[in-house]
From Swiss-Prot:
It comes from Rhodopseudomonas palustris (strain BisB5). Mg(2+) binds at residues 17, 100. The active site is at 33. GO terms for molecular function: ATP binding; dethiobiotin synthase activity; magnesium ion binding. The gene is bioD. This is ATP-dependent dethiobiotin synthetase BioD.
Length: 212
């Protein structure tokens, strides 16, 4: 039976892919990135393969692979590809399934559909990755409101970066959300270092609890 967990973020570059690799590895999950925009450098799927410690068979192929590193709606138009949001259906897997979005919740997949629209049809629990730097309070609370407005279950907040206790506290308090933990920046980003950091700062059981 599939147990899906969606990993999204407050912004692009927040650290979703590294966190997804850590989570997928800790849960021995299957990983899926529905849409990859940008193929010149290491793709998110390949980064997760490198960092998670999972066999390649646990990493599903992307539904859409787009050449240009841009918003999926634009990257698809440049490539002459039509993304069909209704075709993005959660794969049937055994055990946990970690699904990584792109950018933030309102990143457009097409001219009319955003990621959060697809998440709303899935109704799977969401882990919201948030920075700890200046500006994160507003960005994170807005993202929480967007999820709640669409009745999308929020599993909790995974903070990424240096410790910022007050920002983390006020986000959890005002957002009425669960703090899952904080993944620090790592001097050496390796499979072993990432696995150890995740184990120190997160409890894998929290990702299988009921949502807030």
């Amino acid at each position: 039976m599939t147990t899906p967990i969606i990993v999204t973020g407050t912004d692009t570059g927040v650290g979703k892919t590294v966190f997804s690799a850590a989570l997928a590895g800790a849960l021995e999950a299957t990983y899926w990135k529905p849409v990859q925009a940008g193929l010149d450098e290491e793709t998110d799927r390949l980064a997760v393969l490198r960092l998670s410690g999972l066999p390649e068979t646990r990493l599903l192929a992307e539904a859409y692979r787009l050449t240009t590193p841009a918003s999926p709606h634009l990257a698809a138009e440049i490539d002459g590809v039509a993304i069909d949001p209704e075709a993005l259906v959660l794969p049937d897997t055994q055990g946990p399934l970690v699904v990584e979005g792109a950018g933030g919740l309102l990143v457009p997949l097409t001219r009319h559909v955003t990621y959060i629209d697809v998440f709303a049809t899935w109704r799977a629990p969401v882990v919201l990755c948030a920075r700890t730097t200046l500006g994160t309070i507003n960005h994170t609370l807005l993202s929480i409101e967007a999820l709640r407005a669409r009745a999308i279950p929020l599993l909790g907040i995974a903070f990424i970066g240096d410790e910022n206790a007050e920002s983390e506290r006020i986000i959890v308090e005002l957002g009425r959300a669960r703090r899952l933990g904080r993944l620090p920046h790592l001097a050496q980003l390796t499979t072993d270092a990432l696995r150890a950091a995740f184990a120190r700062n997160f409890n894998t059981a929290d990702f299988l609890k009921e949502t807030a």
